[in-house]
């Protein structure tokens, strides 16, 4: 009976160690994802409208560790209606060195919070928004991301090419 007890203890320790290792790996992936996202000059925002995906290049703001992403846009742009009708979005970021990427999936909402609008404003946008009241924010709560980074040896599956996926709490 004693050998069985020790086997159970060893298995329990291995499971705990494996779970801890996975948590550490996920945290490392999150750190690297933020590095790629925040170094990317532009991103590609994809919305869905009438069963068709529409993508456009966007100038995003830095993402904080809470994995909330903001974009500024014109209140009259098509993407605002797309998001109101279907808040599920995908955003793609290429690494600065072009040796990896992060693709996020999340839920978008529209924010007209004046403090946030002031915070997420670039002076060079004055020429695009002569009437600043047309400026609004898209807030994306990131739910998950896929990541590839040659620099950090994060690669897809050798057979399926499926990249690692990380869920955000």
Predicted stretch roles:
Residues 23-24, 102-169:
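Charged, gly/pro-rich active-site loop segments
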Residues 1-24:
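Bacterial Sec-dependent N-terminal signal peptides
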Residues 49, 73-75, 95, 108, ...:
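A mature extracytoplasmic/lumenal domain signature
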Residues 35-50, 89-93:
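A short, Trp-centered hydrophobic/proline-enriched beta-strand micro-motif
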Residues 22-42:
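N-terminal leader/targeting segments and the immediate start of mature chains
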Residues 61-96:
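A short mixed-secondary-structure module that forms the rim of ligand-binding clefts
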Residues 58-62, 106-108:
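Hydrophobic/aromatic beta-strand elements that line small-molecule binding cavities or substrate pockets
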Residues 44, 68-70, 146:
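General beta-strand recognition
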